[in-house]
Regions:
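N-terminal propeptides
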Residues: 1-164, 186-189
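Serine/threonine-rich low-complexity intrinsically disordered regions
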Residues: 62, 215-220
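A cross-kingdom feature marking solvent-exposed beta-strand/loop segments within repeated
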Residues: 113, 173-187
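Active-site-adjacent structural elements in enzyme catalytic domains
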Residues: 132-134, 142-144, 192-217
Length: 220
């Protein structure tokens, strides 16, 4: 915790003279220990907890008042959905390449350092941070509400129904993204391709569905 606070630019001036409790209190106040309420001074942490700390750190504000992940790159793609991972790039490489809703003409981004194949991020929405070369530095999932369902019948012009019988209203200006395609389409242009048995993920903001993601537009 202390090391991450230092990386964020904090020092004993902000944490106070009492160590380690002062640092733990500071970490809690900026959200660094969010989701880790059981964390105590001197307690061991496991890998999952350590990973959570690093994810939290990306979203924390630095001592200068800036969101940390926004200081890491030169270009930030907001509210980006990861459409596909391991895709083929122009040079034939597939190592860690991902396609997102921020890409134009189905271009694929590569990681700035090392290889990666973040399958768990497919279908997630968040902010994509790029360097000067347009390569990925990090992806920070956002806190948008996401609901995944399997369609019980073909999608309709104004709504969809899940296997559990629940119905969801979708506005005509919602964007639909298919994992195998590069660019989004309006709901009215895309809903007819979402047939019974298709799994979709719907993203909501303030109670309104604003985007829909599907790995495929046909029943598998």
């Amino acid at each position: 915790v202390t090391i991450l606070l230092r990386a964020l630019g904090y020092s004993g001036k902000q944490a106070g003279a009492v160590w380690p409790q002062g640092y733990l209190d500071l970490a809690g106040s900026i959200g660094l220990t969010g989701g880790l309420e059981s964390l105590r001074a001197g307690a061991a942490i496991n890998r999952a907890q350590a990973a959570q700390l690093f994810v939290n750190a990306l979203k924390c504000k630095t001592a200068d008042g800036k969101v940390y992940y926004e200081t890491l790159g030169s270009d930030i793609k907001k509210k980006t959905i990861v459409l596909a991972v391991g895709v083929t790039t122009d040079d034939g490489s597939t190592s860690g390449a991902i396609r997102t809703t921020s890409n134009k003409n189905a271009e694929a981004y590569l990681p700035a350092h090392g290889d990666g194949n973040p399958v768990a991020l497919q279908g997630r929405r968040g902010d994509l941070v790029l360097d000067n070369n347009g390569e990925i530095i990090t992806f920070v999932p956002d806190d948008s509400t996401a609901t995944t369902i399997t369609l019980s019948g073909d999608a309709q012009a104004a709504y969809v129904k899940g296997n559990g019988g629940q119905q969801y209203t979708i506005s005509s200006d919602a964007l639909v993204y298919i994992g195998s395609e590069g660019e989004g389409k309006s709901w009215l242009d895309a809903y007819a391709s979402l047939t019974a048995g298709t799994q979709i993920t719907m993203y909501s903001e303030r109670g309104k569905i604003t985007a829909v993601y599907s790995t495929t537009s046909t029943t598998t």
